[in-house]
Amino acid sequence: MVGRSLQGSNRIAGLAEVWRRSVTRLWLLACWLLTVNPANLTAQDSKPVKILVVVSTPTTPADSSAEIFLAGSLPVLGNWAPDGLLLNRQADGTYHGTFEVLPETTVQFKVTRGQWQNVERDADGRNIANRQVVAKPQPDGQPLRIEIQVASWAAEAAVQSTVVGNLSRHEFRSETLGNSRTIFIWLPPDYDQSDARYPVLYLQDGQNLFDRATAAFGHEWEVDETATELIEKNEIRPLIIVGIGNTADRIDEYTMTFDAKRNAGGAGRLYLSFLTDELKPWIDHKYRTAVGRQSTWVGGSSLGGLISLHACLQRSDVFSGCLAFSPSLAWDREQIVAAVSEPHRWPHDTKLWLSMGTLEGGTAESQAANTGRTARLAKLLEAQGLRPDVDLWYRSCESATHDEASWAKQFPAALKALRTVTP
């Protein structure tokens, strides 16, 4: 009865927090709107920008039943679900789709046939970077027209599993968040032959880490291959890696604050509560883990890197280090940078891998902005006492883009940087 009462209390608290978050988001949006001076806005500036995407698919069979989708970074585009926005087939064989966003919003997307196994590719069948467009108001309120030609599609045959080693999957229900997700647990090669306890690395976007068959964009991080190789070479001590699958609420869950420009975000505290108070105790109970903070790290890429930085800021009693690949530092006017800027804000004895590719962004300006933000954060942390390649591993990765293939290349060096798991 006590267990049920506690579960009920947690459930009620979780629902109350979700309600509070919704009210807070509306309040923050209202406050932001009140701060806008109407005198500084034209009618065009204040109206949403309609974007018309026109897709031609010369490699798709001339079949009126074929379905083409946009998968992208907005709720209307499915928050990267592969079947986000269904396009309408026209008489000329092209596919059209429209959606609206606030002016100057940056939108990233790809074209799919409803599954990531059937995502668009270049003419040689290789993966392409996310398409990106900035919503610029058009004369007379006309739609911003984006024309796309799909060069080829990924192979439509069933993708074979690429898992190396002992990987298990579990459906995990969070009472705090009120949703479920897949948890991927990778165990080191000697786990079944030993009674040792192992350090644990928690990584976001778990479906993209181990297996091309589950990876959202057709590429995985090759975490299992990398960890196996480094362990066998005795370059790192064996560890457990937990991949936390994302959900349709990814944007909200991976951000601590509401971003008025994107009209999203702010459930990060709930997500961290799920991670530290629900998932970690379950992992510690089910597996032979070394439970202390010195043996517990957290990491991720993009928004996953952002929430991992916040995890170390908010719960340094749990995590002693962070892997932040291409973190979304621009979120909510660089709120994370402001948080770290407070005197001695970065926790003592908490280490950090921080990397950003030089080609992350759709324009030269956005690429420079991303690398500039990351370099400024690294300098700020060095000024607070973090020593290069001792406490802070900052890397500007030449020609790296914002995708799994780039993060896979960076992962070996990042894993070796973990002093908690090296010999």
Spans of model-derived segments:
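Aromatic-rich carbohydrate-binding modules that target alpha-glucans
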Residues: 59-104, 114-136, 169-172
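Bacterial N-terminal signal peptides
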Residues: 25-37
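Primarily recognizes the serine-hydrolase "nucleophile elbow" in alpha/beta-hydrolase
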Residues: 292-339, 345
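C-terminal catalytic histidine-bearing segment of alpha/beta-hydrolase fold enzymes
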Residues: 355, 361-363, 369-378, 383-423
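Short, surface-exposed "cap/lid" segments of acyl-processing enzymes
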Residues: 192-196, 201-221
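A domain-start/cap signature at the N-terminus of enzymes
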Residues: 128-199
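Active-site machinery of serine-nucleophile hydrolases
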Residues: 210-272
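Gly/Ser-rich "nucleophile elbow"/oxyanion-hole loop immediately N-terminal to the catalytic nucleophile
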Residues: 257-297
